[in-house]
Amino acid sequence: MAAQVPTEALKELNVAEGSQKPGATAQSKTDAAGDEHGGDDSEDEADGHVDGAAPTGEATKKKKKRKPKKKKKHPTSQTDPPRVMISQLFPNKAYPKGEEVEYKDENNYRTTNEEKRHLDNLNSDFLADFREAAEIHRQVRQWTQKTVKPGQTLTEIAEGIENSVRALTGHDGLTEGDAMKAGMGFPCGLSLNHCAAHYTPNAGNKMVLQQEDVMKVDFGVHVNGRIVDSAFTMAFEPKYDNLLQAVKDATNAGIREAGIDARVGEIGGVIQEVMESFEVEIDGTTYPVKSIRNLTGHNILPYSIHGTKAVPIVKSNDQTKMEEGDVFAIETFGSTGNGYVRDDMETSHYAKRGDSQHVDLRLSSAKNLLNVINKNFGTLPFCRRYLDRLGSDKYLLGLNSLVNSGIVEAYPPLCDKKGSYTAQFEHTILIRPTVKEVVSRGDDY
């Protein structure tokens, strides 16, 4: 989920020379495996008869052997659409690791250092939660890439992804507090064409995916508040291939540079250099691919998708360092437009602010809605469809009151100029003591 650079911070960005173009402005977890009580039903087969008495026909008959109980079999593959809980496919919680990358230069010793390896081993629950969330993300997105086609409504696509995530976590989010144990880390974003981020359909939305569209699919999965944030772009016409390749390569460049003691401003410079080495020809016109300079990656905290650190996607003087134990979403956005986004269209994404102060709310609808948010989402982002799903109604006045009071943050869609095309790719990386782990890496990207 994209983080936006505050407007005043843009003035501090030292954008690499030559990158500006004319006109340009970033649980109850259900162990479905269960206890399997196999039936080792031992039986004493008695031929018993009374001494001195002639054995009768009945007494000489052996007892019937009882058939042993059949052991429950664990599912071995995912369904279509995905509905098998991931814990059933991995009953021992041995979830796949992400891509492990050794640190470079002065941090290379960490890979074999015994003390660092010990620290890594202490993080078993932390790693298991992230790897479970990542495997759910991989299975759901690979199903999405296979099944989503032009002609589907955005609502159908978003709900298909979200319902699959809930099924694989085993938490449908309909009972109080259930969505905070595991489920959606934030709403499924489906941003089309010039819209780069934070768009998901509200109730009644009739928008249909078209053959010529470029769609950013950005969704999060959390387990115990540990959020995996990963995104990809879908296009159905080969003319957009270079745009998608530019952004994918830029994201991978950022991942390569990330690590302990890496400075985020320098990472941004590498991302920009790779991104802006591409151009794309669309319908006979050639466009330079630009990094969207007021969007950034970000670190991730428990139950908080946007932490306190940002990873720019253009060169800057930001000297903030990545540190051991950090979790980062490395995401990049490329555009054929201005390389700058503004708020546009109807807002759908919201999140309760972690730093919000107590406010005396006068509207009863605002008080009631805040109670729903606290019990079902906490500081996890939500959208209006999620409130509808919980049975909330006539909440818009209360929601606006919470936003105006500074309790809830609104995240409107972020768009470049109309007629342009934008693309996004994103991975979550764990800055472990011994290696960095691209936990959301898959065969697809």
Swiss-Prot record:
Cofactor annotation: Co(2+); Zn(2+); Mn(2+); Fe(2+)
Region (Disordered): 1-99
Superkingdom of source: Eukaryota
Subcellular location: Cytoplasm
GO biological process: proteolysis
Chain residues that bind substrate: 198, 306
EC number: 3.4.11.18
SUPFAM superfamilies registered for this protein in UniProt: Creatinase/aminopeptidase, Winged helix' DNA-binding domain
Key words, A-Z: Aminopeptidase, Cytoplasm, Hydrolase, Metal-binding, Protease
Pfam families, per the entry: Peptidase_M24 (PF00557)
Primary subcellular site in the record, as a coarse category: cytoplasm
Residue numbers binding a divalent metal cation 1: 218, 229, 426
GO cellular component: cytoplasm
Cofactor binding note: Binds 2 divalent metal cations per subunit. Has a high-affinity and a low affinity metal-binding site. The true nature of the physiological cofactor is under debate. The enzyme is active with cobalt, zinc, manganese or divalent iron ions. Most likely, methionine aminopeptidases function as mononuclear Fe(2+)-metalloproteases under physiological conditions, and the catalytically relevant metal-binding site has been assigned to the histidine-containing high-affinity site.
Catalytic reaction equation(s): Release of N-terminal amino acids, preferentially methionine, from peptides and arylamides
CDD domains xrefs: MetAP2
Signal peptide limits: none
Positions contributing to a divalent metal cation 2 binding: 229, 298, 331, 426
Composition bias type Basic residues, residue spans: 61-75
An example molecular function term from Gene Ontology annotations: initiator methionyl aminopeptidase activity
UniProt function note: Cotranslationally removes the N-terminal methionine from nascent proteins. The N-terminal methionine is often cleaved when the second residue in the primary sequence is small and uncharged (Met-Ala-, Cys, Gly, Pro, Ser, Thr, or Val).
Family the entry assigns: Belongs to the peptidase M24A family. Methionine aminopeptidase eukaryotic type 2 subfamily.
Name the UniProt record assigns to this protein: Methionine aminopeptidase 2-1
Organism: Fusarium vanettenii (strain ATCC MYA-4622 / CBS 123669 / FGSC 9596 / NRRL 45880 / 77-13-4) (Fusarium solani subsp. pisi)
